[in-house]
Amino acid sequence: MSDGLCNGISFNVSEGHGPNYIVGRYKLGFVQQGILFLDPYECLYLYFKGRITFEDSEESALKKLFSITSVERYTAYTLLKNKGYRVHEDNGTIFFRKSTEIPRSVVVVREYDEIDVGKFFTERPDFYFTVDEEGDATIYRIDEIDIKGTENNKIGKCSVTDFGDRHFTKDDLPHWMGTKFHEYRMLTDFEANLIEGKEPKGMAEEVYRDLLSRGCIVKTGFKYGTNFRVYEGEKSEHAEYLVSVVENKLIWYYISRAVRVASSVRKKMIFTTIIDGKIKYIMISRSKDIVI
């Protein structure tokens, strides 16, 4: 008679221990009529720790278990379990806690998964966990952020002249607006539209205006692969933020790349979109560890 069952897979507890030892030592599964019942994550965890053995084919058992779970979610489960958390999975989300604390959540994504950015604001877990195709794991944290600057950006209407497809002005502007071009200041499309009093066109231009209204200095983020680089004020020696405007969905690979670039230049990576008519900002950062 086998010691335990997991989704129809029979197994035995190793080293002469019984089912109650597993429940007491590892806080996994439950015992009913002398049989240890495990969920697929618990079963994989104990198997790879050498605490249980399968009665039938190892390969067929592992194929069945990983078809229910995934290598990526199992990796996240193991990381959390080894840190002493109580861990369980529910509908693709992994929850973990210590003792009676409120559970925290982890969603596991692969590098080429498509992400609905709107869910960062409505269904955001505490952490995202990725395992790349080489098996390396990275932890991400996502926090909604209220960006605020120190500038009084009341910019009056000015005259703009076009030379070719570029915009220029000789009028007085904040020194950070535009780029000096001989006796003119060369303006971006967004800057020119603003000082001419035109309505914004598209989400990116709405975000540009919103950041200005928050007292920030806003410049192009092109060389970083983002829409904007944002300074909290004139006293800022370097931009504090890189901001990417997202219409709908993103491949996680793009998010990961953007976060890495921002981190390498000591800036915070911000993604923004419009939810129910309001501009929202989230900061995505890499975390060295899952800490609660």
Swiss-Prot record:
CDD domains registered for this protein in UniProt: tRNA-intron_lyase_C
Catalytic activity: pretRNA = a 3'-half-tRNA molecule with a 5'-OH end + a 5'-half-tRNA molecule with a 2',3'-cyclic phosphate end + an intron with a 2',3'-cyclic phosphate and a 5'-hydroxyl terminus
This protein's UniProt keywords: Lyase, tRNA processing
SUPFAM superfamilies in alphabetical order: tRNA-intron endonuclease catalytic domain-like (SSF53032)
Lineage per the UniProt record: Archaea, Methanobacteriati, Thermoplasmatota, Thermoplasmata, Thermoplasmatales
Gene Ontology biological-process entries: tRNA splicing, via endonucleolytic cleavage and ligation
A GO term, aspect molecular function: tRNA-intron endonuclease activity
Assembly with partners or alone: Homodimer.
Gene coding for it: endA
The organism's place on the tree of life at top rank: Archaea
The protein's name: tRNA-splicing endonuclease
Keyword GTP-binding: no
InterPro entries (UniProt xref): tRNA_endonuc-like_dom_sf, tRNA_intron_Endo_cat-like_sf, tRNA_intron_Endonuc_cat-like, tRNA_splic, tRNA_splic_arch_long
CC terms in the record's Gene Ontology section: cytoplasm
Similarity-based family: Belongs to the tRNA-intron endonuclease family. Archaeal long subfamily.
